[in-house]
Amino acid sequence: MIPNLKGVRIKTRHISKNIYMLEATGDVAGNIGASVGPDGILLVDTQFAPLAKQICNALRDIGGKEIQYIVNTHSHDDHTHGNAALGENSTLIVHSQVWKQIKNDPNRTLKNVETFDNRKSLYFNGERIDIVHFPNGHTVSDSIVIFNDSNVVHVGDLLNSGCLCFPFVDIALGGSIEGLVNNVESILSTIPRDAKIIPGHYEITNIDGLQMTYGMLLETIGIVKRKIAQGKNIERIKFEGFPGKYDSWGSGYTGASQWIENIYNGSLSSISE
């Protein structure tokens, strides 16, 4: 479903070398990563189709020409709905599971599609770009995109940076609480310590921001699981909440109550399995 986009503007930030981040004001859509150079443009995620004109104008302002590739980190609309509007003549690179989820939606499909299962690499604008799959975390199929020479990593919704927003795990779409924790732990051991990280939402961050999120995941999930083991129902757990140091995390679009519900439902799901 497309949110109200009235008044939304696209902000552009130069990250490193050929890499830029395009952000929609008000956090109505996922952050776009863009490699802009002599080979053309490679986009990571595409936000919503009604924002395509603004996105194209922003790319033009930084010297961008033709969009050669679009990579989707996962299938959610706020990261894929602009595929067709932006990339009519582009090649779409997606994980095979993501392709299954979007292939019947004309807004999200392109004529030229390349799928992969575990990892895909390409050379573009003078550097190697690695697309690495992480299963059953935020959704059934998430990928990160590593711009090696630029030392920038787009991690999609496996991370919402800053102490603003708890994560969201789409259990109905194959995501899992434990999988998200495992994925974040794996990313911490995969990417360079000095890498700049483009998150799915909010501000650019670094390994310290990712580590902070990892610590939050371990502690808050542990709190809810212990209370489940004590026989407390979800309403009681929501009432008791988290320690005060996490108050600010609930100010984004995923509040503490929703995150508790996410953990609770995910924990019961894993128990029933």
Residue ranges and their predicted role:
Residues 2, 189-196, 203-273:
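Accessory terminal helices/loops
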Residues 9, 14, 40-41, 48-50, 96-219, ...:
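Metallo-beta-lactamase
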Residues 13-57, 145-147, 151-155:
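Conserved beta-strand hairpin/beta-sheet module of binuclear metal-dependent hydrolase folds
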Residues 25-26, 37-39, 46-50, 74, ...:
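A mature extracytoplasmic/lumenal domain signature
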Residues 39-40, 65-68, 89, 127-129, ...:
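Loop/turn elements at helix/coil->beta-strand transitions in domains of secreted/extracellular proteins
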Residues 50-53, 57-123:
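Active-site HxH/HxHxD metal-binding segment of metal-dependent hydrolases
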